[in-house]
């Protein structure tokens, strides 16, 4: 799951277990190639400037264009630029984790048409080599629960933790 909002973060699950190393994943801090129309923007991440979070998060969009992505006209270059960065993030996740599915959620992803642009960009970057390998296709989707996905997930995790404590 990748959330795109005030920041960009993500997590991965394998066999119903979260994947992490010594710390939590920092998927939003991957460094993508720069979009040709966005070369002069330094980014807003205080650590890396031009990481995915620094280039495609809500605050980054506001800093460049003064409006949320969803308020900009469909033909505005911001849509292509943001999809570029998120598509590169998706293709990196595909190369490293080879997941069945990548779910993109969060406030920025509520922009109409953005998920389709991200899918198209990921396909351009990763090609059929990563998107469809041996007949197994990775899908790029929106959360099935929409804007309440984060809350529902938190409640489910709390419920599971409570049940485990009762069993111990």
Segments (PLM) and residue ranges:
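ATP-binding/phosphotransfer module of carbohydrate and carboxylate kinases, centering on a glycine-rich
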Residues: 34-168
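Glycine-rich phosphate-binding loop of actin/hexokinase-like ATP-binding domains
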Residues: 1-55
């Amino acid at each position: 799951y990748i959330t795109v909002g005030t920041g960009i973060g993500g997590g991965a699950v394998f066999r119903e277990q979260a994947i992490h190393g010594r710390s939590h994943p920092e998927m939003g801090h991957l460094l993508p190639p720069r979009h040709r129309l966005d070369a002069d923007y330094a980014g807003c991440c205080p650590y890396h400037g031009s990481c995915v979070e620094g280039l495609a998060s809500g605050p980054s969009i506001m800093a460049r264009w003064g409006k949320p992505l969803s308020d900009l006209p469909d033909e505005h270059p911001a849509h292509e630029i943001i999809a570029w960065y998120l598509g590169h993030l998706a293709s990196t996740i595909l190369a490293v984790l080879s997941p069945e599915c990548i779910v993109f959620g969060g406030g920025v992803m509520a922009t109409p048409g953005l998920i389709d642009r991200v899918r198209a960009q990921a396909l351009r970057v990763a090609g059929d080599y990563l998107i469809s390998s041996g007949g197994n296709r990775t899908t790029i989707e929106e959360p099935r629960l929409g804007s309440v996905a984060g809350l529902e997930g938190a409640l489910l995790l709390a419920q599971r933790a409570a049940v485990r404590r009762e069993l111990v």
